[in-house]
Amino acid sequence: EFLTAEALPPETSLFAAAHHLGLLAAALDMERLIAESELPADAPVLAHNALASYFAAALIMPYEPFLKACRDMRYDIERIGRRFRVSFEQVCHRMTTLQRPGQAGIPLHLVRTDIAGNISKRFSLSGIHIPRHSGACPRWNVYGAFLQQGQINVQISQMPEGQRYFC
C-alpha cells in the first residue's frame, strides 16, 4: 500500500507514486547503470533518486506525446501542465530532458532558487553556466520573481564571454 498526505496537490501525489514505482520496477536497471558508472562513493543514493524521478516523469509525460504537446502548444507551460495533469515545475523539468537525437526539443535550462538566491535545483541543456556552490547572479531576474508571484518574468542574460541566453 502506498499512501500520500491528503494535503498534497494531486500532481505531487501522482509524481510521488510514479517515483516510488520507478524505485521498485526499475531497481535492477538502476543498480546496473549505477554500478557501470564512475560515480563517487557517496553518489548512488542521489543517482537512485534522480533515475526514479526521470522514470516518474517519463511515465506521466511520455517522451513523444510530451514533445508533440510542447511543439503543438508552442511550449505553453500552463496548457501542457493541464494536458498531462502535472505542476508547472514538473513541465519545466521534463522540458529540460527533451534531448533525444533526432527528436530534440528546445535546449532549455531550469533554475529553482529561494528569495536569497540559493539554488536548490539546476538543469542546463542550453549551455548557460549555473553555479554549483554559490548563489545565483544578482542580475538574474529570479529575485524579482518573488515580488511578482504568478507571473512569468523573462530576461536576456549575457555572459562575460558574450553568449546570450533567454531566461
Task: Locate each region found by the language model.
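Conserved binding/catalytic microenvironments
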Residues: E1-C167
